[in-house]
Curated annotation (Swiss-Prot):
Coiled coil: none
Organism name: Streptomyces peucetius
Pfam family, one: DegT_DnrJ_EryC1
Gene designation per UniProt: dnrJ
UniProt keyword list: Antibiotic biosynthesis, Cell membrane, DNA-binding, Membrane, Pyridoxal phosphate, Transcription, Transcription regulation, Two-component regulatory system
SUPFAM superfamilies: PLP-dependent transferases
Full protein name: Daunorubicin biosynthesis sensory transduction protein DnrJ
Length: 370
């Protein structure tokens, strides 16, 4: 049987009754758009984070777009983020007319190197956008200190780190707003697309709710500020309500898979396993490892019917769609080096032990033969 980085069927078979009941609940409610399930999920997701406000949207990319717009970010502004991220992080900045500015990442944990932030803040900088990557939290203390010093907004990208903590603080609870994705692969994933923005600020939440609904305010069909059609689907919201109750269990399942990888692969020369940043409680959205012979390893593993991913093979600043930003080879040396060495092993809480052992045995054989 083929082995892939992620699949949902094991989880669905375990939770099928609850998932189908969620669908039935929505269909029987008579509310298909912005109904009880969306409102309840928003309340429960906000409460999970200890925050007063949550706005459900249609996907994680638009969570970032609406988050930026609600914080007043637009044309002429610069937003500082990383290039070692999923492209949608940067696409969202471009979508609001702002300019992405990149900072390099840490060699050890691949997170934003906050020690370099000051060097890229300029007169047009208006927002810092840290990405909590692969399941770990960025060190928010220097981010918040610089934001306060320079009067900048902070939008956290939490798409890959639901439930992650650093020094006890949940991701998404320290910035002016935080964007989440519920793409099916996520730690908290829907059975389709979904996203949300959480915030402690009532005015930001008011703007978000208008922006997700064409820009309409109190009067239906009257647009105050042109917005988007970006509503969280009612069925997905009800599924997410059920899954939110199991989020901590999903995280523990991922950590168990990670522990087995550490036991089975920790002694292999040249293979670098994830390093947990100081104070972090890793939730292992993906299990990213490094090896200088990455491409040879991936090719060899296909003979074992094991098909792995790279997160991410092309840094965003090297993509043709962002050539106008003027970055060149060597501008972000750590990011560029990592892109040639990292790859992801299968990681999801319903990964069967026999499937994981197959991966461990194959990786040991391939890496050991190099």
């Amino acid at each position: 049987m083929s082995t892939y980085v992620w699949q949902y069927l094991n989880e669905y078979r375990e939770e099928r009754a609850d998932i189908l009941d969620a669908v039935e609940t929505v269909f029987e409610s008579g509310q298909l758009i912005l109904g009880t399930s969306v409102r309840s999920f928003e309340e429960e997701f906000a409460a999970y984070h200890g925050l007063p406000y949550c706005t459900g949207v249609d996907n994680g990319t638009n969570a970032l777009v609406l988050g930026l717009r609600a914080l007043g970010i637009g044309p002429g502004d610069e937003v500082v983020t990383v290039s070692n991220t999923a492209a949608p992080t940067v696409v969202a900045i471009d979508a609001v007319g702002a300019t992405p500015v990149f900072v390099d990442v840490h060699e050890e944990n691949y997170l934003m190197d906050t020690g370099r932030l000051r060097s890229v803040i300029g007169p047009r900088t208006r927002c810092l956008l840290p990405v909590h990557l692969y399941g770990q939290s960025v060190d928010m203390t220097p981010v918040l200190e610089l934001a306060a010093e320079h009067d900048l907004k902070v939008l956290e990208d939490c798409a890959q780190a639901h439930g992650a903590r650093r020094h006890g603080r949940l991701v998404g609870t320290q910035g002016h707003a935080a964007a989440f994705s519920f793409y099916p692969t996520k730690v908290l994933g829907a059975y389709g697309d979904g996203g949300a923005v959480v915030t402690p600020d009532a005015e930001v939440d008011r703007r978000l709710r208008r922006l997700r609904y064409y820009g309409m305010g109190e009067r239906y069909y009257v647009v105050d500020t042109p917005g988007h059609n970006s509503r969280l689907d009612e069925v997905q919201a009800e599924i997410l309500r059920r899954k939110l109750r199991r989020l901590d269990a999903y995280v523990e399942g991922r950590r168990a898979v990670a522990r087995r990888y550490e036991e089975g692969l920790g002694d292999l020369d040249g293979l670098v396993l994830p390093t947990i940043a100081e104070g972090n409680d890793h939730v292992y959205y993906v299990y990213v490892v490094r090896h200088p012979e990455r491409d040879r390893i991936l090719e060899a593993l296909t003979a074992y019917d094991i098909h792995l991913n790279i997160s991410y093979p092309w840094p965003v600043h090297t993509m043709s769609g962002f050539a106008h930003l003027g970055y060149g080879p060597g501008d972000l040396p750590v990011t560029e080096r990592l892109a040639g060495e990292i790859f992801s092993l299968p990681m999801y809480p319903s990964l069967r032990p026999d499937a994981q052992e197959k991966v461990i045995d194959a990786v040991r054989e391939v890496v050991g033969s190099l």
